[in-house]
Design a protein with these regions (language model features):
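Extended C-terminal regions of large enzymes
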Residues: 45-83, 89-430, 434
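Hydrophobic or amphipathic alpha-helical targeting/insertion segments
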Residues: 2-26, 86-90, 97, 106, ...
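Short secondary-structure transition/capping motifs
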Residues: 4, 29-33, 225, 294
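Acidic/Gly/His-enriched mid-domain segments of enzyme catalytic cores or analogous surface patches
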Residues: 17-64
């Protein structure tokens, strides 16, 4: 069994790596270099059959060009989105990694396992615990955060706008939703696939493209850019997907560039398109330029909004918390958590949720919560758990699941292991700062 895959060095030419239970192959991929994420996926699925037993990780032009906001696409609808993993693959001339499963694990023979499995399955599918994620999905949060004045609009010049009704979770579901799908083996179906229709010939010849949507992409390609047409938002998401960019960093960086253009810091000479809040067409061009590193400005912006601001000016309105902010303007605890976390990720602790339910402004209580919540999430993440299911996999249930599988020592040590992982993360962060 492979527990980890480490790929040192750099290939002499573009390659893809195919890994299976009994094989590891390096295949020439020069003909894939320069292709967008979607075209690469189509070709690789034909080359490596085995849907449901195969995972394809791939990058787009942004990764090839070394962008710090290049993502790694995982099986089309999911991503290693943040921290520039796509740029790391690109630096190695590694266009894709294909992992093919050939074996299965034996299930426990005890009567406890099927009984517990059924209980967990019912929690996932027949209770309210996960219904939010299946029904409207994470976009259900858009209207709620907008009402609380916690939703970033137009580079955070506003935190609420009545036009949210045009791009709410309900609006996307009513007018754009094609279907739900799920990660392999998951019964929830939280992936929401919308459609974009495009006329390619007169009089009535259309094609449609399928685009997955969630809260964060709608924030970054919608509210942050002032776009309130849901189909335009989906079209921008589609451009981001093809380029292989992290949608949050791309949207927030372009929002900064738009305000910089408003203030006269940037001109169309740099942006190559007239960026204006609410105008989707120039943003589609800008996303392509950002992925391609079309000029000096876009190559610098691809290293992060602060990098560009350091060169051109405008750092005071760059919405960056270590990396471009996530879609929450909930308050001090969220801002602190993302700014100081190891990955500068809103998912490392629930600071955004803490702000919404605590008005006491007590720093000690907030810090205690962040430390405790980070350790619990670190353990869940190390289990390769979906954080959407954290409400189901509470400590007692997770311990019972591990025990039923025979991992009794692990089941009895979850708190200690979570704190150990957390300590390793903090040590890594300290070492990064010393090197930096």
């Amino acid at each position: 069994d492979l527990e980890g895959l480490v790929i040192p060095g750099e290939a002499l030419r573009p390659i893809c790596l195919a890994v299976g239970g009994r094989h590891m192959e390096i295949k020439d991929a020069h003909y894939l270099w320069g292709l967008d994420v979607q075209h690469v996926g189509k070709r690789l699925r034909r080359m490596f059959p085995g849907s449901g037993h195969r995972s394809i990780l791939r990058i787009g032009p942004a990764g090839e060009n070394g962008s710090a906001m290049a993502c790694i696409n995982a099986d089309t609808y999911r991503h290693f989105g943040r921290m520039g993993g796509g740029g790391v693959m690109g630096s190695k001339n590694l266009k894709a990694i294909i992992i093919q499963g050939t074996e299965s694990f034996d299930l426990p023979e005890s009567k406890a396992y099927p009984k517990l499995f059924q209980s967990v399955y019912e929690k996932m599918t027949a209770t309210d615990m996960m219904s939010k994620y299946h029904n409207l999905g994470t976009p259900v949060n858009l209207e709620a955060l907008n009402e609380l004045k916690c939703l970033p609009w137009r580079n955070l010049k506003q935190s609420t706008d009545p036009e949210i009704s045009e791009i709410s979770g309900e609006a996307f579901a009513d007018e754009t939703l094609l279907r739900n799908t799920a990660c392999s083996g998951c019964p929830v179906g939280c992936i929401h696939i919308g459609f974009v229709r495009e006329q390619f010939d007169d009089p009535h010849h259309f094609l449609y493209r399928q685009v997955n949507y969630d809260y964060e992409p709608i924030f970054s390609m919608g509210t942050m850019l002032g776009i309130t047409d849901k189909f335009q938002v989906l079209s921008l998401m589609d451009e981001v997907e093809k380029a292989g960019l992290d949608v949050m960093s791309a949207g927030v960086a372009l929002a900064w560039a738009t305000e910089a253009a408003e203030k006269g810091i940037l001109s169309e000479k740099e942006t190559l398109a007239p960026l204006v809040f609410g105008d989707a067409k120039p943003y589609a061009e800008a996303v392509r330029h950002l992925g391609a590193g079309a000029n000096d400005f876009y190559r610098l912006l691809g290293q992060g909004a602060l990098k560009a601001a350091d060169h051109y000016g405008g750092a005071d309105f760059a919405c960056v918390l270590g990396q471009e902010m996530a879609g929450y303007a909930t308050g001090e605890v969220f801002f602190t958590a993302q700014a100081h976390g190891l990955r500068h990720s809103h998912l490392d602790s629930g600071g955004y949720a803490y702000d919404q339910v605590h008005e006491d402004k007590d720093p000690e209580s907030a810090i205690d919560f962040l430390v405790r919540d980070e350790a619990e999430r670190a353990f869940l993440t190390s289990m390769v758990s979906c954080l959407f299911a954290r409400g189901v996999y509470k400590k007692d249930l997770l311990s019972e699941c591990l025990g039923t599988l025979g991992y009794t020592v692990l089941a009895d040590s979850m708190d200690d292991i979570g704190r150990t992982i957390q300590a390793l993360r903090w040590r890594t962060r300290s070492e990064e700062r010393r090197v930096g």
